Amino acid sequence: MRQLSTTALVLFLFFYCSISTAWSLPYFAYRKRIPEPLLNKPRSRHARSIEDLDGLKEWLSNQQPLRGAVMAPPSEDNKRTVTVKGGANNEPTISDVLPKTRGINIYASLTRQFETVERRLKDQTQNVTVLAPRNSAIQDLPHKPWENPDDYEKFGEMNAYEGDKGQDRAKRNLERFVSAHVVAQSPWREGEEAETLGGDKLTWRKDGDRIYIEPERIRVESIAEQVSNGEVWVIDGVIN
C-alpha cells in the first residue's frame, strides 16, 4: 500500500512538472511576424489637383473603375434636380453637379482642364446635354484619351507626344475627346440631330426601355442629373 502511494506521488509530480513547463513556453514568440511593410501599408490617395498634362496622365493611369456602382435604366424617376448652390440665379449648373455624379469622376475631371468647355458647362444662357462616359468605359479604351493612332503612324511611338509639339498634340486630342461628349443643346429630342462642341453630329433613339446614342449605338445608362442649363446622361461607352 505504501509502495502504491509513493508511485502515485511520483506520477503526480511528473505530470505537474510537465504541465508547468508547457505553460511556461513562450508560445507567442514562435508565431510568424507580419512584415513591417504590410503593417504600415500606405492609404490610398484621394483625387489630386491636376496642374499639367503630365500630372493628368499620371492621375488618369491610377484611376480605377468604381465597383458595384450600377445605374438604373433611364426613366422619369432618374431625372432629379440637385440642391446645390450654382450660378448667378443660385440654381445648380452642369458644372456644379458633374463632379458629384456617381461613377463618372474621370470625365468630370477632364472637363475642368479646358476653359472653353468649363465655361460652357457654367453658362446658364446656353443649355447642353453632357454624355458622360462611365469610369470603366474610359478605362477600357484601347488607348488613352489623349492618344491618336494617326499621330503614332505619322510621328512614331517615341516622338508622337514628346517635346512641346507632342504635348500640344496630346492636349488637342484630349480637348477633342472631352468636347465630343458635350451636345450643344437641351432638351434634346429623339431622332433630332444635334452637334457636339467638337463638331460631331449625333442623334438618339429609344429601343424598348433603353436609349442609344447614334450612330455608334452607345447605351445610355441613366439620365443622372437635370439642372438649370441642361442634363447629364451617363453612357456605357465613349464617342470616338
Swiss-Prot record:
Gene3D superfamilies: FAS1 domain (2.30.180.10)
InterPro entries: FAS1_dom_sf, FAS1_domain, Mug57-like
SUPFAM superfamilies: FAS1 domain (SSF82153)
Subcellular localization: Vacuole
Presence of the UniProt keyword Ligase in the record: no
Chief localisation class: other
Top-level taxon of origin: Eukaryota
Any one Gene Ontology cellular component term annotated for this protein: vacuole
Keyword Signal tagged: yes
Signal peptide start and end residues: 1-24
Domain annotation FAS1: ranges: 91-239
Keywords: Signal, Vacuole
Pfam families: Fasciclin
Name of the molecule in the record: FAS1 domain-containing protein AN1527
Organism: Emericella nidulans (strain FGSC A4 / ATCC 38163 / CBS 112.46 / NRRL 194 / M139) (Aspergillus nidulans)
